[in-house]
């Protein structure tokens, strides 16, 4: 069972070393789940004397006003008889103190290091472990004494600040409260009892200690309180007799003081029947046994909390990403790896693993055919326009059989209008690819760490897409222009035969501009243009996919990679300038994860029975 208190001691020390003081923060706290005994009392209540009596050593700073200005986590470890007793501070891990006057001075010095030489207070605890044959395994937290007025050099808020600090410890359900009250004062006004009842109205966590019993007025005693008939608590009150100021001045040692305490309760008529339940030695043993029971009951819940929190912290740490490499090669590798992840996500969008790529197909299957269908050839093939273009093409020599130049001009003027839908398809696919770049950037978790790299990758990808669009537009419009520059001969070779089948080809050339003839020309041109549209409907998507989609998958960041190879250390570092908030969060999560893993190992190493 003694291992359980040692276990909690180790975890408490790890908590303090890694910044978990149980204060409110955005991080999970292990400190709050650990059972502890907090010592609460007003100034001059005898709180320090009780602690020194339990330890059996003079080691606490003394003086007027507020002496305890930081929580002192006092961890007592029983060692074998005959072994020399010593003390260790968590902040001085390799130094053993055998002179307890030096311990007192170090407590004062460490307090001043945190608070300055003012009379301010701090919630950051000091950890002190004392190893002695004369103690029981016990952990106590000495809190600043409650006060009603501020002294010179202290802020007006000190009274409330101390109360808030004390309350922050004792209001936690795993905290056992040791309420110190002087017997020579009215218990109804006890600061310790008052605040304890506020946070623990049922008294399930509160132990009462009466000090200065030997200083009560003649004719009065504390029997009713100690017997539980007055100011009743769930656990029995314990009376103690501490050294007087005169004893302290005379350097009366603790062994003699404990002996005198035992004799006082044994020899005083009023308390003789309670003697075996009084005194600092009984108090220490009672608290040690109670703390053991509480720890044992809490261990399963602590284990469950630790295991759950470790998983949560590991998940968040993974999401935050790895810390930045220090050397140029490491930085370059990190950037390339992040870019590779982005590129992979972008390809997954195009290949259908992620949503978005289907929009490109929709352009070819719906948007382009619909745009071609909406083209208005009526204007080019209106009767007046056909007559105008045919006669202009003939010049001063009318055509003999078929108005070839007229056909060419009519076809060219109609096919040119296809450039609009072709160009629109290129632009639409470009917009889709840009949107997929932004989506891929947002979905690349690693890019969230580095805002500068995020901007550079986005800009580089968009710049590449812009160049690909220009190449695609040029190639696609060339397809349209090729249809204008060379007509499909086989289509027109059939026209004379059709003419012969339909009538007299030797009809007067002056009658060939009649409406029937012109309509026939218009019909032939429209048939040819429709044939061209059908062909371009298939070839334009191929050109766009080849020049834009395929190239985006192959070489979206090639130019950026080439630039990376020329960057110096300063430029690479600027790309990996991480958001300070993320850096701080990762550092905090790493420390807290280290704490929980250490606690996990400590619990696993202790043999305890459920």
Curated annotation (Swiss-Prot):
Q: Which GO terms describe its cellular component?
A: cell cortex; cell plate; chloroplast thylakoid membrane; clathrin-coated endocytic vesicle; clathrin-coated vesicle; cytoplasm; cytoskeleton; microtubule
Q: Which residues bind GTP?
A: 44-49, 212-217, 242-245
Map out region (G4 motif) in residue numbers.
211-214
- Enumerate the InterPro entries for this protein: Dynamin, Dynamin_GTPase, Dynamin_GTPase_CS, Dynamin_N, Dynamin_stalk, G_DYNAMIN_dom, GED, GED_dom
- Alphabetized GO MF terms: clathrin binding; GTP binding; GTPase activity; protein histidine kinase binding
Subcellular localization, as worded in the UniProt entry: Cytoplasm; Cytoplasm, Cytoskeleton; Cytoplasm, Cytoskeleton, Phragmoplast; Cytoplasm, Cell cortex
Q: What is this protein called?
A: Phragmoplastin DRP1A
Q: Which gene encodes it?
A: DRP1A
